[in-house]
Amino acid sequence: MLKLAIPKGRLEEKVMELLKKAGYTFQKESSILREGEDVTCFMVRPFDVPTYLTYGVADIGFCGTDVLLEKETSLIQPFFIPTNVSRMVLAGPKGKKIPEGEKRIATKFPNITRRYCESRGWHCKIIPLKGSVELAPIAGLSDLIVDITETGRTLRENDLEVLDEIFIIRTHVVVNPVSYRTKREEVISFLEKLQEVMKNDNHEKSHR
C-alpha cells in the first residue's frame, strides 16, 4: 500500500482533482482518506508534508518549492504538477529604498531568508512570524519582508512593493528515497498515472 501526504489548504483541491483523474476515489475517515487497499492519504499541514516523508510515515507527497527549500529536505523530486505559480519575494514600503546597514526582515521562512541575505552579503536581523507578515513594516517591526505573493494584491493593499524576486514556487511531487527503493514498482506506477493525466490535460488545452 502507498501512503500519500496531501497538503491541506490552497493545494488540496488541485491535488485531489489530479488524483481523481488518475483513477483514485477516496472515502474520508477524519484526516485519513482511503482508496480501497491500494492508497491511503493523510491530510496534513503543508509544512508537515516533508516530515511525514522523512520519517517514513508517507511514501509520496505534494508540496511547494517554498516548503522544500525552507525544510532543506533530501527527498526525491521527480516532477511538479500544474498549479497557479506564485513567487517568493523581498518586499518593502512603496517608494522606499532598501536600507543601508543592518536590515530587519520579517518572514515565515527564516531559513530561506537567511540564505538569501547571505547571498547578497547583507547583515540582517530575521524576525520569524506565523501570521500576517505584510503588517510588520506598517507596525514598525521590520524594514522589509520575505513572503509569498501570487497576484501582488495583498502587498498593494498594505502599500508594499516587490523589491526582488527570490524564486518561483511550484507544486512538487516528492518521494521518500527509501520508499522509492522498497516500493519501486508501486511508486513508479503511481507517478506514471499522474504524468499520463497531466499529458492528457495538456493535449486537451492545446486543441481548444
Curated annotation (Swiss-Prot):
The lineage of its organism: Bacteria, Thermotogati, Thermotogota, Thermotogae, Thermotogales. It is found in: Cytoplasm. Heteromultimer composed of HisG and HisZ subunits. One of its GO terms (cellular component) is cytoplasm. Catalyzes the condensation of ATP and 5-phosphoribose 1-diphosphate to form N'-(5'-phosphoribosyl)-ATP (PR-ATP). Has a crucial role in the pathway because the rate of histidine biosynthesis seems to be controlled primarily by regulation of HisG enzymatic activity. Its EC number is 2.4.2.17. GO terms for molecular function: ATP binding; ATP phosphoribosyltransferase activity. CDD domains: PBP2_HisGs (cd13595). Pathway: Amino-acid biosynthesis; L-histidine biosynthesis; L-histidine from 5-phospho-alpha-D-ribose 1-diphosphate: step 1/9. Pfam families: HisG. It is an enzyme of class 2 (transferase). Lacks the C-terminal regulatory region which is replaced by HisZ. Gene3D superfamilies: Periplasmic binding protein-like II (3.40.190.10). Its main location: cytoplasm. The keyword Cytoplasm applies. It catalyses: 1-(5-phospho-beta-D-ribosyl)-ATP + diphosphate = 5-phospho-alpha-D-ribose 1-diphosphate + ATP. Transmembrane segments: none annotated. InterPro entries: ATP_PRibTrfase_cat (IPR013820), ATP_PRibTrfase_CS (IPR018198), ATP_PRibTrfase_HisG (IPR001348), ATP_PRibTrfase_HisG_short (IPR024893). The keyword ATP-binding applies. This is ATP phosphoribosyltransferase. Belongs to the ATP phosphoribosyltransferase family. Short subfamily. Keywords: Amino-acid biosynthesis, ATP-binding, Cytoplasm, Glycosyltransferase, Histidine biosynthesis, Nucleotide-binding, Transferase. GO terms for biological process: L-histidine biosynthetic process.
